[in-house]
């Protein structure tokens, strides 16, 4: 779920395709909702969040570079790594 969330945040931030924004935002919403559910069901998962962060981001970045080869994406996460921020912030605004 975290990889899918990163993919769609990256798309929304760096791919200028307004006709796709709605779909990407819905996916971001769904992934955030599902991650929050997982954290409520198993709060101990939060401890592993930062450990998984870099691997998930790197996997997402590789995938999105294949999907959008003509677009530029940062090689590192450009925003805060706080769980609450990732699950709530509108990074594209």
Segments (PLM) and residue ranges:
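Surface/interface-facing alpha-helical segments and adjacent flexible terminal/loop regions used
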Residues: 1-93
């Amino acid at each position: 779920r975290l990889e899918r969330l990163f993919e769609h945040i990256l798309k929304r931030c760096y791919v200028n395709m307004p006709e796709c924004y709605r779909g990407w935002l819905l996916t971001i919403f769904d992934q955030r909702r599902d991650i929050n559910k997982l954290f409520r069901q198993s709060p101990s998962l939060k401890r592993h969040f930062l450990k998984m962060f870099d691997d998930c981001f790197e996997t997402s970045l590789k995938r999105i570079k294949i999907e959008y080869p003509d677009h530029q994406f940062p090689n590192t996460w450009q925003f805060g790594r706080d769980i609450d921020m990732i699950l709530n912030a509108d990074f594209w605004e």
